[in-house]
Every structure is written in structure tokens, then in C-alpha cells.
A protein has these predicted regions:
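Conserved alphaE helix
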Residues: 14-15
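Single conserved hydrophobic/aromatic residue that forms the stacking wall/gate
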Residues: 1-7, 11
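Regulatory N- and C-terminal appendages and interdomain linkers associated
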Residues: 70-171
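Catalytic activation segment of kinase domains across protein kinase-like and atypical kinase folds
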Residues: 32-33, 37-82, 92-96
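Protein kinase catalytic-loop region centered on the HRD/HxD motif
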Residues: 25, 30
Length: 171
């Protein structure tokens, strides 16, 4: 039982949490990978295959940078969900070594994968709040989401917006 032992913690922390943290970092920087298929993801949580990647200029939540991604599968706003999907694909490949009983292996893998959403949200909230010079909270999340809406409405450059905000000095 790989997932009922200490290896479960390794998988959770070292694969799921690193993937969540990596994609939260991308989102916080306005980075669009472009080709997040499973063979372009590393279990160590590092970015590879910089083919059609880009830093977002004018903010558009559904921005795509791969010329073949007509459906928007790897769009900016899809990256967190694709990260989770890729982890599910990895878990599916590992089912035979998780538990000999397939149903039990699926149950154990699902238990691990349920932590992805909260892990991503935590790191993303911390990164977004930090970009505004705040601690992560419901209020900082609301403020950041409102800022993204303004950025999208006016097609503001992702990086330049935060540089400009940083230059504001309050007495």
C-alpha cells in the first residue's frame, strides 16, 4: 500500500503540493505555459518545455499562446485545473502500485488528490496578496480579483500594472 504509508505524505507534499505551488507561481506572474500536456510536467514541480509560453501583456483571463490550442484547453485560467488533471493522470498510472485492489487504489489516490485545490488556493492567495503588499485573507482575495477585472476590462499589462502599483507611495 504505497498511499497508506509514509510514501503518501511524500507524494502529497512533493508532487501535489509542488505542482500546486508551481502553477500558483505561474498565475501570480501572468505566465502562460501553453502546452501543459502530461509529458511537459515534472513531479519535482519545475517548468519544462518553454515552446509556446509567454508572459501575459494585456490581461485576458482566457489568453492562449499555443497556435494549436484553438479550444483554450491550456488558457491562463485553465492552468490550475489542468495541473490537477495531470496529477490525476499520474495517479492513474500509479494505481497498480498504490494497491492491488483497483477500487481501493482509486479511493486512496482520490484522497491524496483532494488536497490539490486547497493547496493551490492557499499558495495563490498568498502570492496575490503579497503582490498587493498584504497578508492573505478573504479581503485581499476580493481586492485582487477586482483588480484582475479592471486589468481585463482595460487590457492592462500584467507585469506593468504591479510595477506601477509598487511605485505608489502613501504618506
Amino acid at each position: 500500500h504505497l498511499f497508506s504509508s509514509a510514501a503518501s505524505d511524500v507524494y502529497k507534499r512533493q508532487v501535489m503540493q509542488r505542482t500546486a505551488a508551481l502553477i500558483a507561481a505561474w498565475q501570480g506572474l501572468g505566465f502562460i505555459h501553453g502546452v501543459m500536456n502530461t509529458d511537459n510536467m515534472l513531479i519535482c514541480g519545475e517548468t519544462i518545455d518553454y515552446g509556446p509560453c509567454a508572459m501575459m501583456d494585456g490581461f485576458r483571463i482566457n489568453q492562449v499562446f499555443s497556435s494549436i490550442d484553438h479550444a483554450g484547453r491550456y488558457a491562463y485560467h485553465q492552468q490550475p485545473a489542468i495541473g490537477q488533471w495531470n496529477l490525476m493522470a499520474l495517479s492513474d498510472a500509479l494505481l497498480p502500485i498504490i494497491d492491488p485492489d483497483r477500487e481501493e487504489a482509486i479511493r486512496l489516490a482520490k484522497g491524496v488528490l483532494e488536497g490539490y485545490g486547497p493547496a493551490f488556493k492557499l499558495v495563490y492567495a498568498e502570492r496575490c496578496a503579497a503582490k498587493l503588499g498584504l497578508e492573505a485573507s478573504d479581503e485581499s482575495d476580493t481586492l485582487f480579483q477586482s483588480l484582475l477585472e479592471v486589468m481585463q476590462k482595460h487590457q492592462l499589462d500584467f507585469t506593468d500594472t504591479f510595477i506601477e502599483l509598487e511605485s505608489i507611495r502613501f504618506n
